[in-house]
Structure formats: structure tokens, C-alpha cells
A protein has these predicted regions:
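Active-site beta-loop-alpha junctions of metal-dependent nucleic acid enzymes
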Residues: 20, 27, 33-37, 51-75
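Short, surface-exposed connector motifs at secondary-structure boundaries
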Residues: 75-81
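RNase H-like polynucleotidyl transferase catalytic core
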Residues: 81-86, 101-119, 135-138
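Basic, flexible linker segments flanking DNA-binding modules
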Residues: 1-16, 88, 96-98, 111-114, ...
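C-terminal domain-tail junction helix/linker
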Residues: 100-104, 126-172
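Extended, low-complexity cationic-aromatic segments
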Residues: 1-42
Length: 172
């Protein structure tokens, strides 16, 4: 799960001339909030599933997991294990119930050791540099509207060095 600050209407300060403050942000009187980018990556194929949700609560994460499992099942992927960090949303009872309900073994990374979950961490970095901050967006809705197109590119067109220059979809 990666948190991204929302883009204000009219565009954010990242691409503004002189990197000028726009008057919105965490310390302003009108904060915009964040989008919680919930991410699932298939270990073998690197097929990615992402949703932008409003929070990272256990109930929200469990709902995301159900939708991610349906996505992977539709692609012919059988999920046997899930590797997560130790966030409270992944340690919640409702999240554990969903994994048990689907017969999935839940494994957690060592605390303060993000390298253990390297594929997801690397995907988060790619998502930031190639989609979220790749160009100026005029609003948060515009940025989120481009997410499905970027995921299609990532899953079906982009070649991955870690899997022999293949696309994730070709490894299913």
C-alpha cells in the first residue's frame, strides 16, 4: 500500500514554474488528503492489480483482497500465499478471515525490512515515477482516470528485465 497526496484542481506544485506553493497541502488550511494505493503483485508473472482507496483500514484492505483474488482468478492465477508487511490493516481480524476463507497462507515480512517485499516496493516506485508523477495532472480525478491505462501498459506491453524481457501477461 502506497500513499499518494491528492492533486489539487488546476494542477500541483511539482510542475509549477519555480516550484511555487499552491496554498494546499498537509500544513495548509485546506488539506487535500491522500489516496491509498493498494497493490497486489503476482510473484511469478509480475501481473499487477491496483486500486486507489480512501483509507487503509482492515475492512477496506480485506475488500481490496477479495477483488484482487477475483481479478487473479479470472486470469487463471491460483493464489496460495500472500506476503504483506506488518501494517495494522494486514494484521486485522477481517483480513485474516478473508485469507482463511480462501485457503490462503498469510506470511508477513520482518519488521523494518522492506527489502523482503521487494517486488511490491519496486512496483510502488515504478507507479510513482511512470504514472503518478510522470507529468502534470490538472486534477486528482484526471490522474486516477489514467491509472487503468497505465496498468494495461504495465501488464500487457511493458517488458520486465527480471522476467527475461517478457510481459507479465505472457507469463500466465
Amino acid at each position: 500500500m502506497k500513499k499518494l497526496g491528492r492533486v489539487p484542481d488546476g494542477g500541483g506544485k511539482r510542475f509549477a514554474p519555480g516550484f511555487k506553493e499552491t496554498g494546499v497541502g498537509p500544513r495548509s488550511k485546506r488539506p487535500l488528503g491522500i489516496d491509498c494505493m493498494h497493490v497486489a503483485i503476482d510473484d511469478h508473472s509480475r501481473l499487477a492489480y491496483v486500486e486507489a482507496l480512501n483509507d487503509e483500514k482492515g475492512v477496506t484492505t480485506a475488500g481490496f483482497l477479495k477483488r484482487a483474488l477475483a481479478f487473479y482468478l479470472a486470469k487463471g492465477v491460483t493464489v496460495k500465499r500472500i506476503l504483506t508487511d506488518n501494517g495494522t490493516n494486514y494484521r486485522s481480524q477481517v483480513f485474516a478471515d478473508v485469507t482463511r476463507e480462501h485457503g490462503i497462507r498469510l506470511k508477513r515480512t520482518r519488521p523494518y525490512r522492506p527489502q523482503t517485499n521487494g517486488k511490491a516496493e519496486r512496483f510502488n516506485r515504478i507507479l510513482q515515477s511512470k504514472w503518478a508523477y510522470s507529468r502534470r495532472f490538472n486534477s486528482n480525478a484526471e490522474r486516477l482516470a489514467e491509472l487503468p491505462d497505465y496498468l494495461d501498459y504495465y501488464n500487457y506491453t511493458r517488458q520486465h528485465g527480471g522476467i527475461g524481457e517478457a510481459t507479465p501477461a505472457s507469463r500466465l
